[in-house]
Amino acid sequence: MLDRILSKSRSRYDTSDRTYGARHDRVGRHAGLSRIADEIRDDIALARVVFSTPTLPGQLAAPDPIGDAPPGITYTVETPHDAGIVITINDVPADWGWISAGGVEAVSPALRALAGELAKLMDGYNHYGAHIGRRFFGRIRVGGETLIW
């Protein structure tokens, strides 16, 4: 949890032509995707418990898309391919996750913020650079729709 809080001030670190995510060292550089997926699951579970606690009246509440999401939402973190991690957001309430604009359903800003926060969390375990490839490719999905690739 401390890594999550500190990542706001300590984002990526660069080494010549390589960029490493803030959580890259937590799993070790030779860790497999299943280990990284386990860490992502733990980060999501911890964020839901810590950041979903209500604040007392008169206190400032820091917005957190994971903690502010409806409690019925569930998450699955899978590694369906050798170089891919997929986070799927399930059981999203229709009135919270989608808006209707001119008869067309679109993803709500709250669901986009949640997907963006999950993508940042997942990207914290990644690395990339000019002479190295990505450690993995990540996707954030809701149902059959990919929100972030």
Where are these regions (language model features)?
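Intrinsic low-complexity, intrinsically disordered or marginally ordered coil/linker segments
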Residues: 1-149
